């Protein structure tokens, strides 16, 4: 059937419902940036659900193939009818039938992805019944509402390697650190690849080197290294709002920064190293007037979920995935 019209009352109902679920969600929902098929279901009461199937292939040689399947089909549903489970179920069934006619949707390195608000419990059972698994979370932290942010702590002077006092030092990463940043970053990808959404590809390290060089090329990059006795034990890298424009439409406040990744050496876990890195980033982001910071973590990562919760992040969107894309039930 043709996609229903959400004009007039349908859009208003959808907006009211969404903002009741989570006031940090954006409205209207992000449009698919690539062309795709419009989908929709309706009932006697008017529009129940609609979405647009976004098709795209990860760009070879970039970091994009490391963050998911080589070919992806994504849906961000808008639910306007009173029965969320029924509307979503009909939309997913229509999407399944659409993908069945798309050549290659059953190939191994494909995925069907639904972005669903994390606080919206009404769709969870429907997604599970249609063959989707919750794999990734986009989490959000809002800047504290208080007096002006405390000034940044001056960075300590470099110490000689091997001074042996065991002191943890956090410093800004600079261009000469680009290769080190890439080598630490790939450890994050290797660890997260255990949880189903992230993949190390043959050219991932080369792509990370290019990404690190670009990040560190500017003045005062948002990247920090933690060192103990002169040895690197941690890394945090983030994008300022002007570079985080690709993810900013997923949240209803601005400006938004994006925490790209954080690595802590396994021997350092529980020592406060990760907390020091996060505090450095938060102080700088808050001082710059950033309203919200966003990050992704793997839903099944037993370390990420409690760590980021302790540091003020909570789920905003959950990525549900069926692999291959034809696996939707």
Language-model segments: residues:
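Conserved hydrophobic beta-strand within the GNAT/NAT acetyltransferase core sheet
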Residues: 114-115, 259, 293-297
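Conserved active-site alpha-helix within GNAT-family acetyltransferase domains
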Residues: 118-134, 275, 288, 299-317
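Conserved donor-binding loop and adjoining core beta-sheet/short helix segment
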Residues: 26-98, 233-255
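A conserved beta-strand-loop-helix scaffold within acyl/acetyltransferase catalytic domains
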Residues: 53-58, 197-201, 205, 210, ...
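Conserved acetyl-CoA-binding loop-helix of GNAT-fold acetyltransferases
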Residues: 84-101, 261-264, 270-283, 287, ...
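Acyl-donor-binding surface of acyltransferase catalytic domains
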Residues: 79-153, 164-165, 318-324
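Conserved GNAT-fold acetyl-CoA-binding loop/helix
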Residues: 2-33, 192-211
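A short beta-loop-alpha structural element at the N-terminal edge
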Residues: 1-12, 169-184
């Amino acid at each position: 059937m043709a996609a229903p019209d959400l004009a007039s009352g349908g859009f208003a109902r959808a907006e009211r419902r969404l903002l009741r679920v989570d006031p940090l969600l954006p409205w209207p929902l992000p449009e698919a940036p690539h062309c795709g098929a419009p989908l929709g279901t309706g009932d006697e009461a008017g529009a129940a659900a609609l979405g647009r199937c976004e098709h795209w292939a990860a760009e070879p040689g970039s970091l994009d193939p490391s963050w998911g399947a080589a070919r992806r089909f994504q849906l961000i549903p808008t639910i306007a009818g009173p029965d969320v489970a029924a509307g979503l179920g009909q939309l997913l069934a229509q999407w399944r039938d659409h993908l069945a006619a798309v050549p290659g949707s059953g190939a191994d390195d494909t995925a069907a992805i639904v972005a669903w608000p994390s606080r919206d419990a009404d769709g969870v059972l429907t997604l599970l019944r249609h063959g989707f698994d919750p794999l990734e979370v986009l989490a959000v932290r809002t800047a504290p509402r208080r007096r002006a942010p405390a000034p940044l702590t001056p960075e300590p002077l470099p110490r000689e390697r091997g001074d042996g006092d065991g002191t943890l030092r956090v410093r800004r990463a600079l261009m000469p650190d680009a290769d080190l940043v890439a080598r630490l970053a790939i450890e994050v990808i290797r660890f997260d690849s255990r949880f189903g959404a992230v993949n190390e590809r043959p050219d991932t390290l080369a792509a990370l080197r290019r990404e690190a060089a670009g990040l560190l090329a500017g003045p005062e990059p948002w990247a920090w290294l933690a060192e103990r006795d002169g040895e690197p034990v941690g890394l945090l890298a983030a994008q300022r709002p002007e570079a985080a424009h690709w993810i900013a439409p997923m949240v209803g406040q601005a400006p938004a920064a994006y925490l790209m990744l954080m690595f802590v050496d396994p021997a350092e876990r529980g020592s406060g190293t990760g907390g020091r890195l996060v505090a450095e980033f938060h102080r700088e982001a808050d001082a710059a007037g950033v309203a919200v910071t966003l990050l992704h973590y793997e839903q099944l990562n037993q370390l990420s979920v409690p760590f980021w919760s302790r540091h003020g992040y909570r789920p905003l969107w959950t990525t549900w995935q069926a692999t291959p894309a034809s696996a939707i039930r």
